[in-house]
């Protein structure tokens, strides 16, 4: 069965509309007083105060609870409405409500809202006439009951006094609003133009930075290509040097063991990584110099044993 929650939705809509009306009333009052304000700050402060008052006073929960009771009755569940009826007719409830009313009267009096203002506000309401500046004063049910009970009297000592009505210069009001509008329009245009200029500068800087990045990337690509070519040339040169040394080694009158040892050292050279290849060359040269040094020491010892001397030329 479809549940009806139209009353709760209407109550929630009324509460939300009341909040929006409070925000509009606050901002319009500040504008009429010529006070500059931040809309977001006003909205946040009114929202915080409104939520606190509605929650702390229990008004929102009371309204939503009554709306839920009505929706339950519309859905065929009358137990909650019967409990509310019994609660409203209980003597303790009446006494408690009477006590709350007295507290509210004392609170209103302490705030400067006297009995005359409270009674007049309870007896009359003002209805605006659509499309006109005039309004209609309506009597409430309390006023009707007071008339029926004879609690309304006409003051014979009332003296009609002339009311001084200030003539509103609508043209000056319009001109003032127009000047304010033009001033606000100019400020908005200035801010917008400044924003456009800043956005253009940011866009130009971004384009310039993008061009620099593109140039740097192209330069990096060129260096990478050159580095790859240089690496291939070094690999080719190292390979040709090894081949040349091997060919030269085969033409020498050295023993096969020595040739084999040198060829093994040459074959161990890294042809892929030039840095490692230079390290291998350094190792081979160190070994050759070390072998030459040992041969020279042996030759020097033989000369000394044979009582020969040697000189460098």
Curated annotation (Swiss-Prot):
This is Non-structural protein 3. One of its GO terms (cellular component) is host cell cytoplasm. It comes from Rotavirus A (strain RVA/Human/Japan/S2/1980/G2P1B[4]). Residues 150-206 are annotated as: Dimerization. Residues 166-237 form a coiled coil. The lineage of its organism: Viruses, Riboviria, Orthornavirae, Duplornaviricota, Resentoviricetes. Belongs to the rotavirus NSP3 family. It comes from the Viruses. InterPro entries: NSP3_N_rotavirus, NSP3_sf, Rotavirus_NSP3. Pfam families: Rota_NSP3 (PF01665). Its main location: host cell. GO terms for biological process: regulation of translation.
């Amino acid at each position: 069965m479809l549940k009806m929650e139209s009353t709760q939705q209407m109550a929630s809509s009324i509460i939300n509309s009341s909040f929006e009306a409070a925000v509009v009333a606050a901002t319009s009052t500040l504008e009429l007083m010529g006070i500059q304000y931040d809309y977001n700050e006003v909205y946040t402060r009114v929202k915080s105060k409104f939520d606190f008052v509605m929650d702390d006073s229990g008004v929102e929960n009371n309204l939503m609870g009554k709306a839920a009771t009505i929706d339950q009755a519309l859905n065929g569940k009358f137990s909650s409405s019967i409990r509310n009826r019994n609660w409203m007719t209980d003597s303790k409830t009446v006494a408690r409500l009477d006590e709350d009313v007295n507290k509210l009267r004392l609170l209103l009096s302490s705030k400067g809202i006297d009995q005359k203002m409270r009674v007049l506000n309870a007896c009359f309401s003002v209805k605006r006439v659509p499309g006109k500046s005039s309004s209609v004063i309506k009597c409430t049910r309390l006023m009707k009951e007071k008339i029926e009970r004879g609690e309304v009297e006409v003051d014979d000592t009332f003296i009609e006094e002339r009311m001084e009505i200030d003539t509103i210069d609508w043209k000056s009001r319009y001109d003032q609003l127009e000047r304010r509008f033009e001033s606000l329009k100019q400020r908005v245009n200035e801010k917008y133009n400044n924003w456009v200029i800043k956005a253009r500068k940011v866009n130009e800087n971004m384009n310039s930075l993008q061009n620099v990045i593109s140039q740097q990337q192209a330069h990096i690509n060129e260096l990478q290509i050159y580095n790859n070519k240089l690496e291939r040339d070094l690999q080719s040169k190292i390979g040709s040097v090894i081949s040349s040394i091997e060919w030269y080694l085969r033409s020498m009158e050295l023993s096969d063991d020595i040739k084999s040892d040198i060829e093994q050292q040459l074959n161990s050279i890294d042809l892929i990584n030039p840095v490692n290849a230079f390290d291998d060359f350094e190792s081979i040269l160190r070994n050759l110099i070390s072998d030459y040094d040992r041969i020279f020491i042996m030759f020097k010892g033989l000369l000394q044993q044979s009582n020969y001397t040697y000189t460098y030329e």
